Every structure is written in C-alpha cells, then in structure tokens.
Amino acid sequence: MSEIVWRAEPLAIAASNIQDFTNTLGAKDYDDLLAKAAADPDWFWDQTIRYMGFVFEKPYDRVRDLSKGAAWTTWCLGGTTNATLSLLDKHRDTPTYDKDAVRFEAEDGTVRVWTYEELDHQTCRLAAALTELGLGPDDKVGIYMPMVPEVVAAFFATARIGAVAVPLFSGFGHEAIATRLNDAGATAVITIDGTQRRGRLIPMKPVMDQALTNVPSVRHQIVLRSHDVALAWDDNRDHDWAGIVAGKPNFVPAVIVDAEHPLLLVYTSGTTGKPKGTILTHVGFTVKIGFDLLVCMDLKPDDRMMWISDFGWVVGPMITTVCCLAGATMVLVEGTPDYPEPDRMWRLCEEHKVSFLGVAPTTIRGLMQAGTDDVEKWDLGGLHVVASTGEPWTDEAWKWCFEHVCRRRAPLFNWTGGTEIGGGILVSTFMHPLKPCCFGGAVPGMEADILDDAGQPVATGEVGELVLRAPSIGLTRGLWRDPERYMETYWSQYPDIWRHGDWASRDADGLWYVHGRSDDTLKIGGKRTGPAEIEGLVMATGLITEAAAIGLPDPRAGQSVMCVCIPSPGVAADENTANQVRDAVAAGLGHAFRPKDVLFVSDLPKTRNMKIMRRVVKAAAQGQSSGDLTALVNPKAVDEVARAAGQVWLISPCAETNSMGSYQRKVILVDGALDAAILPD
C-alpha cells in the first residue's frame, strides 16, 4: 500500500473553506459531515445553497421532490432565479467589481484583461442584442468558440436571457456540429472567425457555415471578428458581434426563470449511436460546481485559476461559472500548453500569478517527455492548489507532478465525476492526507459507495462499481429527448441507485481510487482488473509514452490482454520492446495478465479532453463499428489501430509456434515508415 506523501499543516486546515463549512454545519469532522448529509439531505443542500450565496429572485418552498423516483428528482421547488445574479449582479457595488475577472493570453503572447465591470457590461450588451433578435428562454444557442474572453460573455449573455447554451468543441468538424445543433433544436449560434493553434490560423466560421447548411432551425449566427480574414457572409443570418452590441446598454435585467430551467445542454460521447445531451440547470450546475471547487478544493476570491481546456467540454463552463461565483480570476489561454515554447504552461503560471492550476494526467505525461528543466526554471511557489480530473493517473505521472509542479508543498487534488454529474463524486480536500493517485473521499450529499454485481458493498481493497445512493443537485435532468437511454445507462443495474460506470476501491486508510471505466474492465481467467493498472505498468518502463490496454476474446482465458502502445522517442517498435512490455505487466500483476498482443502505433484515439477512447481501440482492433466518433480529435488514429490489428486476423500464424500456439509477427513498414506492428506472444 502506498505511503502518505502529503498532509496539510494545521493552520492551513483551519483556514480552509472545507473546515469553515464543516464548522458552519456543526459537524465534528469530514466523516461526520458525510453522515449528517446522508441523514438529512434536504437540510444539507439547503445549508449548502445558503453557504454558497446563490441568489434567488423568489425563494424556494421545498429543497427537492422525489415523488417520481430518485432518477427524476427536482430541486428548489417554487424558486426562481438566473445564474448570472450569482455570477455578476452580486458583485456590483463591491470591491470585486473593480478586480480582474478574466485574464487572457493569445498564442502570440498578446494579453487582454477584463474586470468584473467590463465582463458585466460585455454580457449585458450582448444579451440586449440577442433579445433584439427575438431570442429568449425557449431558445438553444450553440457556442462554438475558443477560450477567449468573449466566450464568457457569450455564455453569460445566453444565460441572462434565459436561453440554453449548447457548448461545441472548437475542434469539431461540420458534421459533429450539425448533429448536436439539430438534436438540440438550436435557433442561434455564436462563433468566431478563427483561432490560432500551433502557429496556424484555424478557421471556425467557415466550419460553422458548412454545418448550418444542414441545420435549418438556426436563424441567427453572431460572429466575433478577431483576425483580418475574409469571410463568406449571409446577410439574412449572420450578424457582426461588434455591430449588434454597438449602442446597447451596459445593464439589462436578467430574465428570471425557474430554478430548474436548463442552463446548459452539454453533449458527451455515446458508446453507440448519437451523443448524449446532458441537461444542467441554473441552480443545479452553479451550486454543485461551486460546492466542489469552492468548498471542497478551496478556491478563494484572491485565487487566479488556470485550467487549459475548451468551452466544448464541461470544464470550460465550469471555469467561467466557479470563478465568478467565488469572485476569483480566471486565466484563459489560446492554443496548447507546449507551444510556441515547451515550457509555456509553467511560464503562464509564473507570469499570470496562477494560484489554482487545473491539469489532466494526459497533459502531464506529455510535458514529462521534455524532462524537468522546463518546469524547474519557473517560479511555481504561488500555487495554492493543483487539481486534476478527466482520467486516472499513472503512479509515475502523479509523482512527477507532485514533485516538480507542486514542489511537494501544494496539494495535488484528484477530482472525478463527469458531465452527467455536473461536477464530482470523489474529491480531495485540505482535511485529507494524500497518497499517489488517491482521492481523499466522497463529495458530501451524494452517498457514494462501491458495490459488487449483487449490489453489496465491497470489502476494503476490493474493486467494484462506483455508485450514488442519493441524487445530487448537480445531476443531469435526464438525457435530452431520450429518457429511456437515461434510465438504461445510469439507473438500471441497481434500484434507485446511480451507476456511474467507473471501477473504484478504498484502502485501509479510507482513501479512494478510480481504476477506469467498468465497461473497459479486463477479466482474465476469472481475475478482474482495470486497464489503468496495466497501462501504468507499461508506461513505468519508460519505453512507452501512452498505452491503451484492452481485452480481446480468448478461447482459453475468456479474454486476453492487448496493449496498444506509442513508443517513447528513440525506442524501437520491435520484439524486444514488446517483450519488455509483457514482462513489466506480468511482474506487476501476475502471468495471467501478461499481454498476448502488443501493438505499436503512432497515435491513440482521444476525445477533446484528451481521454484515450479504449472502447474505440477495442472496436477497431476487432474490426467492429466504433460508434459515435464525432468527439475524437484524431479520427485517423482509429484507422491506424484497425489497420495494424488487422494484421493479426488477416495473416495466418507462423508454422512454427510454441506449445501455447502463440507466435511472433515482425514490424510492418508502410511507405518506408513505421506504421504499426502487432507482436502476439
């Protein structure tokens, strides 16, 4: 079992938001807080809403209604509000109104700063323009923009008029955009001419124009001009941002809506079929995301948060919402963390005085390849918290980040949940010690547990399904236009219990761990493990940059392990490397999990938030349909995996095999370059 590597100092615990919240609710400690929340959820969420300072126009009569079942819980009955009352209006006539709300750095180094006053004015002017176009609470507004200051105004203006924002990944092609806009029934979109990425201007309005040829419901397209480029223009549909906001007032009142009115319609990838539309409400999303980051992870008004992401993933709306709820400053960045210099991310931290840094394990693994010189030369002493979400860590990457980014001083807080949760299920706080890759505990108010297939809690150290025994205020209100899919996906395995689809465990110290998606689990000869454990062992060899471990049908063991690997720079994709990969897994997990197949590729299929899509890898390796691929940033990687894996099925085994019937296959070169190699054992 790993050793504890960090504990907060007593003074830091005493000064933390989680300690203040615990004291306010009269709990003795974190475990007592969990127990009180489970014993009286209505009391807990009522206290949480009050503590967060969420503003209602009309107070609610009841905290929640479960009369239709846990899956269809409604919240804050009778209450009316608008999220922007808590994000903008409450800061007027306070010192916060004059402080920085948004700091932005473009890829070329240009910096722009908006105060809360400027953000408020920009939001209200655009809201007035949208209202003049006839948009209001019945409308869905697609937002297809990079993380520039105006994306915050676009989101808040949409919310202010009561319309529903539909975030769209800035790297989507026209088909993915059209699919989501049609499903949402969008009537307007807000976009930009283009954005810089790795030294190139990436067009965005032309992509949206092409998408809109297949979306007849969209009547209006608002376009932000940020570059001197010629644009095709439809006078009946297109509106120049600067033109429509000119002369509009700096203040317009928020349209008051029901507390349960949708704020966001966020699409996530579906395993099969169309993407899933999650419905996040004004009260639900704002309170839940605020509780997780302000209370649990200690975001404070004087923090500057940087979390390099995209508005099309829920982290984008999260950053904008939680920073303004706290009165903190968001640091937005155009482009990638390693361009134009490999140390760009660390320079941004020092120069913008970032104190709350969000990272993804994939990003850290990529930056690790440059060594430690790039990170060590920058002053990261201002970091108060480093937070992580998106996927499980490998032990090596977590330790590297804790050592070289956190400097063993700032905590590395793990946080897991998802778009459908509207926040997290597991989190770390200043009250919890840290071990590599751990979560401190469950988020209060959700009754997280770990169950076996029969619905019984698993023993300490055992792996099971991560579930919620109680609905949370942040949960999606179903799936857009698909209630049957919602019930089947999340509520069908255990009665009135949310099954999240992740494998999790708890150790003897009460710390939690996530082992990957439960539908990615490998079961070899009756023994079960998550792919993250195998992948961690593979990457710990130093030979492999990234890996995806999948299970393939095997007549003897039920499943056999295939590792699809990206070799580290300078490492040969040959039998020697493949055998070292096999040996590392066997040494760590036992011979039963020794990979039968090792496949080398140049890229792995990833989503917009850089998660490796194992289900896509598995489908490609078996020549099956990969389902919805619109969220992939690199769909060509699917073809590469399929092409390489096809060598197993299309080429007969060598005549000479060992007693187990296994065989070796040589590296395959395509057009004189390494394409892929499948090396069965």
Enumerate the predicted regions with their spans.
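AMP-dependent adenylate-forming
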Residues: 18-19, 23-25, 87-115, 225-233
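Conserved AMP-binding/adenylate-forming core of the ANL superfamily
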Residues: 33-36, 84, 98, 102-156, ...
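Conserved pre-ATP/AMP-binding loop-to-beta segment of ANL
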Residues: 98-100, 221-223, 234-267, 274, ...
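Structural core segment of the AMP-binding/adenylate-forming
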Residues: 160-243, 360
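AMP-binding/adenylate-forming catalytic core of the ANL superfamily
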Residues: 168-194, 208, 350, 357, ...
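Conserved AMP-binding/adenylation subdomain of ANL enzymes
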Residues: 286-304, 314-355, 370
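Gly/Ser/Thr-rich phosphate-binding loop
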Residues: 325-328, 354-359, 368-434, 447
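Conserved ATP/PPi-binding loop(s) of AMP-dependent carboxylate-activating enzymes
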Residues: 441-445, 456-490, 529
